[in-house]
Each structure stands twice: as C-alpha cells, then as structure tokens.
Amino acid sequence: MSKVYDWFEERLEIQAIADDITSKYVPPHVNIFYCLGGITLTCFLVQVATGFAMTFYYRPTVTEAFASVQYIMTEANFGWLIRSVHRWSASMMVLMMILHVFRVYLTGGFKKPRELTWVTGVVLGVLTASFGVTGYSLPWDQIGYWAVKIVTGVPEAIPVIGSSVVELLRGSASVGQSTLTRFYSLHTFVLPLLTAVFMLMHFSMIRKQGISGPL
C-alpha cells in the first residue's frame, strides 16, 4: 500500500495538498452561522444524487410525466423516500441560501476585496431559484402546468421582445411538450452544470481570500 501511495505522491504531491488544506487558518470569530454556505452545498449534493436516481424512472413527456412520478412514489424501491428527500433538501437549500445571504450581508462579507465572491453568490442565488421554477413543473400536474404557464407568461409584458421571449421559453406559442422538454433539460443538465462552475469559483475565491473578519 505504501508503494501505491508513494507512486501517487511522487506525481501529485498529495501530502502538500493535504498540508495546505489542514493548515488553513480559521479566524476565532467564526461560529455556526458561517457554516450556512457549506450546508447549502451539502443540500445541492443531495439534490444531485437523488435527482440522478429519479432520472432512471422519470419520463419527460406530457403524457407520461405524471404517471412516472406516481410510479416513483408507489412502485419503485425507495422511490417515495428518494423523491421526498429531494423535495425536502430543495426547500432546505433555498432556506440555507437565504440565511447565508443575510449572514454575509450583515457581517459585511461583500465588501472589498470580496466583491466578486458576492457576485458569484448572487448568481448562485438566481440559479437556485431557477431550480425551483423548473423542478416545480416536472410532475406535469395541474399545479406544475399552471405554474409554468404563469411564469413563462411574465416576460410578455416586456415591450417589443416580450412575445419572442415567451416563445423561446415555451418552445412554441403555448405551453406543451416543448416547454416540458426545455424545463427538464434546464433542470437536469444546464442548471446543475452552471451551479457547479459558479460554486467552484465561489469556493476558490473564499479559499484564496479567506473568511471575512468580524463586523
């Protein structure tokens, strides 16, 4: 085993990386409220795991979406638990993100030189809200359908380009299969990818600049 470790150590300098991680200074003023961002990340990872599990059974078509969700809840092994955890962690992620934003704002964590960290955090907040909007529609029940119809209809109030934006979001003039396909793609691929990228940027900047000082 030591030879295997030495082989990787010679090429990747694992010990140097470990020393850098474990030797990072944590300011004495840090308390439990500084963990809210990490809890949000944990909720996101739970979302990825449970969401991936549900893709084995979910069918993103207007005729089969609702039935596939029912199958997950009643027939698939532990499907009810996986979907429930997905829903609960989604609510928890939104709550923790809001509390994290308040903590950062109240402690002045957005000030120089951490402006870009704040900007990436705001982008992550928008992405989190987008997860909620797109995920809400996927069961394609009455609530999901009308929620999509209302949300995608909002841009119509924009002068000149409003109708084009609505058609872009829906995939056609009305809500239907194209809309569900778009929202499913956004929810399962585009948004997770963007979230992972901005989280990496967010945590890299925190790692570089350190935790902000007390108020």
Curated annotation (Swiss-Prot):
Transmembrane segments: 32-52, 90-110, 116-136, 186-206
UniProt keyword Oxidoreductase, yes or no: no
Main subcellular localisation: plastid
Cofactor: record remark: Binds 2 heme b groups non-covalently with two histidine residues as axial ligands. Binds one heme group covalently by a single cysteine link with no axial amino acid ligand. This heme was named heme ci.
Sorted UniProt keywords: Chloroplast, Electron transport, Heme, Iron, Membrane, Metal-binding, Photosynthesis, Plastid, Thylakoid, Transmembrane, Transmembrane helix, Transport
GO BP terms, alphabetized: photosynthesis; respiratory electron transport chain
Gene Ontology molecular function, alphabetical: electron transporter, transferring electrons within cytochrome b6/f complex of photosystem II activity; metal ion binding; oxidoreductase activity
UniProt cross-references to SUPFAM superfamilies, sorted A to Z: Transmembrane di-heme cytochromes
Entry annotated with the keyword Phosphoprotein: no
Pfam family, one: Cytochrome_B
Membrane topology: Multi-pass membrane protein
Subcellular location as annotated: Plastid, Chloroplast thylakoid membrane
GO cellular component: chloroplast thylakoid membrane
Names of the cofactor(s): heme b; heme c
Binding site for heme c: C35
Positions annotated to bind heme b 1: H100, H202
PROSITE patterns attached to this UniProt entry: CYTB_NTER
Binding site for heme b 2: H86, H187
Misc remark: Heme 1 (or BH or b566) is high-potential and absorbs at about 566 nm, and heme 2 (or BL or b562) is low-potential and absorbs at about 562 nm.
Annotated PANTHER family: CYTOCHROME B (PTHR19271:SF16)
Known partners and oligomeric status: The 4 large subunits of the cytochrome b6-f complex are cytochrome b6, subunit IV (17 kDa polypeptide, PetD), cytochrome f and the Rieske protein, while the 4 small subunits are PetG, PetL, PetM and PetN. The complex functions as a dimer.
Function according to Swiss-Prot or TrEMBL: Component of the cytochrome b6-f complex, which mediates electron transfer between photosystem II (PSII) and photosystem I (PSI), cyclic electron flow around PSI, and state transitions.
Protein family per UniProt: Belongs to the cytochrome b family. PetB subfamily.
Name of the protein: Cytochrome b6
Source organism: Lotus japonicus
Gene: petB
